[in-house]
Amino acid sequence: EMFALLLCGTANAQNITEMPSRLKTFTDNLGTVYASYTQTKTLPESTKTFSANGTVKFVKGVGFKWKQQKPNAFEFTSTLDSYCVNDDTQALSDLPYFSQIQSVIKDMLDGDMSSFITAFDADYIEDKKGQNWTLQATPKISAIKDFLSSMTLAGNTKDLKQMVIAYKNGTMIIINFKRMKTESADEIKC
């Protein structure tokens, strides 16, 4: 539904040079979030759609823990300086593209759009009467654009509702989020 805002053009898109007000309200309100997610993945060489679901816990300024429940259980945790898949910890510098994206997103969540603007060409859309927004980003720097075609985030002033990731190889991932009222005791550390 949020992605439809971008596709239907119900509002005027603007190129981002500073933090739009609704996006700023969203980042200011973001603290600790626990959400369920559903994910669909399509591969360019297949007509089959792959589905997954699970939970994610995000703590602003700390990182996130992604717990997939189906089809296979696994955990991915990202902190400010490391990441781990299940219990295998690695330095974040071992994944330079992910490290760069994580740094850009951290700055953006802290209210600083400068590294985002340096790394991405971005269009931002707000609906005319609600609280919804869509941010579509196309990478400008080679560390990111060598593998990523675009990333679209959609939400409102309280929640991220959807993320769409399009990779250079044609793979497309659509993730829908739903905030949960219960808190997770999961620690975000590797």
Residue locations for each model-derived region?
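One face of beta-strands
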Residues: 31-39, 52-56, 64-66
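A mature extracytoplasmic/lumenal domain signature
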Residues: 39, 62, 68-72, 80-82, ...
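Short, mixed charged/polar active-site loops
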Residues: 47-53, 73-75, 148-150, 172-174
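Short, solvent-exposed helix-to-loop capping segments enriched in aromatics
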Residues: 100-116
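Gly/Pro-enriched, hydrophobic low-complexity segments
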Residues: 113, 117-190
